[in-house]
């Protein structure tokens, strides 16, 4: 048939509630800095602005007044929580489609660590990997239209474990959502738990299920 199916490997899908909470936090910070009106929206949001390259990418926000805000991903509270798997959807911690269980013809994924294996193709803008899952006739047509290099499966998985396994649910995920529901600022909720928090977590785990 003519049907060609493609899926992609993702880190996980974050909570919509958390995303909205983060945006509200940034709008609140913006208003506090300017002392002006109430900023209600953004013109543009980029998770990975690569002006400084992939390895030093920024999260970029452009507010309704066209002012731009950029922050290094490792210092941005939202990205810190996302990278540490703090607020992925519950199903993401037990993803049923990793390890090529979707049965698609092709799978796309990030080739993290390519700079250590094939530095000659690393442009610091991001390199993708294409898995050919069957002998679909479309393969030859596709390869004639792209620049590619054959690599080993082990080399790819070494830098991107999402291809074959889900991330563990963080022990303090429940505490994070509890803080958020109590009205803590987003940046304070994202902080790792202190001693009191850890004691409370231990008590709560006795009565609650994990993700």
Task: Locate predicted features.
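Short acidic, glycine/serine/threonine-rich loops at helix termini
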Residues: 1, 17-20, 57-60
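A short alpha->loop->secondary-structure connector
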Residues: 1-8
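Internal, well-ordered alpha-helical segments in soluble enzyme and binding-protein domains
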Residues: 5, 15-19, 88-91
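Active-site adenylate/phosphate-handling loop in enzymes that bind or generate adenylated species
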Residues: 8-9, 114
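Functionally engaged cysteine thiol sites
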Residues: 10, 20-21, 92-95
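Short, charged, surface-exposed secondary-structure boundary motifs
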Residues: 12-22, 119
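Long, compositionally biased charged/polar accessory segments in the mid-to-C-terminal portions
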Residues: 27-211
């Amino acid at each position: 048939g003519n049907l060609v199916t493609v899926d992609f490997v993702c880190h996980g899908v974050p909570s919509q509630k958390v995303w909205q909470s983060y945006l509200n936090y940034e709008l609140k910070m913006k208003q506090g800095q300017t002392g002006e009106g109430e900023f209600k929206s953004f013109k543009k949001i980029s998770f990975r602005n690569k002006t400084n390259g992939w390895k030093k990418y920024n999260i970029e926000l452009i507010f309704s007044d066209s002012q731009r805000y950029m922050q290094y991903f490792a210092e941005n509270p939202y990205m810190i929580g996302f990278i540490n798997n703090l607020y992925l959807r519950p199903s993401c911690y037990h993803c049923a489609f990793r390890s090529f269980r979707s049965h698609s013809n092709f799978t796309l994924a990030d080739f993290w660590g390519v700079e250590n294996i094939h530095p000659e193709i690393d442009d610091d803008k991001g390199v993708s990997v294409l898995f050919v899952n069957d002998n679909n006739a479309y393969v030859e047509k596709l390869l004639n239209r792209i620049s590619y290099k054959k690599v080993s499966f082990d080399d790819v998985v070494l830098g991107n474990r999402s291809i074959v396994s889900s991330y563990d649910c963080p022990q303090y995920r429940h505490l994070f959502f509890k803080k958020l529901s109590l009205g803590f600022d987003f940046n304070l909720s994202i902080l790792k738990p202190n001693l009191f928090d850890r004691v409370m977590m231990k008590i709560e785990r006795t009565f609650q299920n994990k993700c």
